[in-house]
Amino acid sequence: MHQLEAERPDRMEEACGVFAVQASEQPVANLAYFGLYALQHRGQESAGIAVFNQGKVRLHKDMGLVSQVFDQDVLARMPGDLAIGHNRYSTTGSSRVCNAQPVVLMTRLGPFALAHNGNLVNAAELRERIDDGQVEFTSTTDSELIAFAVQQAVDRGLDWKAAITSAVSLCQ
């Protein structure tokens, strides 16, 4: 057997689907919808899209397939020029709407949205480090831990790039 063959699984392995888009001339919610639809095989438990518009974020997420979570009325109420979307295949946290992504948090620099595909092996340690008594966890996902790590770094005075770098450095 060749090394390349050994590295390829003989079955499909699932994980969440993440899609982001920035466009000023097109409705990004629609583009994110179609991106998530194309990635739907990656996760079919829940879907969500966060759209940024003039410093504010509009978030819509729910349980179900992309076509069940979003319709044209929902997408029309999500104007903006930047979007991030997520299809969930749960590996950490139960299959409940509170665990649907993206995660949106407020920081001193404004809103922040995060969608994550993967698992943290140090989630328990990261939760202990982040939980300063002020954090109100709303999910059981490790993705929320990353978002709170970014939020705390921003609120300590870091800019976006430094805050994200700091948060990622805590993740294993």
Residue ranges and their predicted role:
Residues M1-Q172:
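Conserved short alpha-helical segments that host acidic/polar catalytic motifs at enzyme active sites
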